[in-house]
Amino acid sequence: MSIVALLIGLGPLIGWGFFPTVASKFGGKPVHQIIGATVGTLIFAIILAVVTSSGFPTGTNLLFALLSGAGWGFGQIITFKAFELVGSSRAMPVTTAFQLLGASLWGVFALGNWPGIGHKIIGFTALVVILIGARMTVWSERKEASNAKNLRRAVVLLLIGEFGYWLYSAAPQATSIDGLTAFLPQAMGMVIVAVIYGFMNMKAENPFRNKITWLQIISGFFFAFGALTYLISAQPNMNGLATGFILSQTSVVLATLTGIYFLKQHKTSKEMVITIIGLVLILVAASVTVFIK
């Protein structure tokens, strides 16, 4: 692995690792966050399409790319709602675990991954380890009823949001276009969902006139940077799909730690140790699910 490939492979660490923290730092409600983030992603995607002349898909390729982006928009709205309940440092490991679980199960039952009994035993064991790791990251010494209730609500929300993230990753598999070509219509699908959600919240306030909404465009740049560098990293002449995926998953570590330290989402020393162990379990088990394909 060259230095250039490694640096590109760690791009998602920066983009996706800082995205939830930046979005939370700017504040606002989920409606402000999703509109700003998706507009930022769309701006990034338009510039990228112009610079690379990547073309624009049509027909079913366009439809599935739009559906993919719409799925992400739905999933991210739900995730932002979970941030309100438990903070990004607790929500991110859980949503990452659910996404790994969903992608792996889809790969096994729809795409024929993990052939043979031995691979399936290893794979499903790894999924159990991922869930154990996620549970460890949200463990708390304080057994307050309100905290437990908020955590349960957040987990349910994130489980629902996984359907959107699953669509985000699964829909492009029905197309004949590469990730770079799909990026712009995906961003359009994200914005469509965000705008619809914005209009659904118009009775409370007009989110399109709130300055926080447009400040959140910066958070969208972080997400888009992570997505772009992942697409490049996954190319065979760079890191390849398996290594690129594993490098991208390190973003959950940065997202969790920046949430704790930058957003002051306090954890005790014991909670920190257990959280770190949980994150390591998630990363190691995620690596296993990739290499047994």
UniProtKB/Swiss-Prot annotation:
Signal peptide: none annotated. Its main location: membrane. Coiled coil: none annotated. The gene is rbsU. It comes from Staphylococcus aureus (strain COL). GO terms for molecular function: carbohydrate transmembrane transporter activity. Could be involved in the uptake of ribose. CDD domains: ribose_uptake_RbsU. The lineage of its organism: Bacteria, Bacillati, Bacillota, Bacilli, Bacillales. This is Putative ribose uptake protein RbsU. The chain crosses the membrane at residues 5-24, 34-51, 58-80, 95-114, 121-138, 153-170, 177-199, 212-234, 241-263, 273-292.
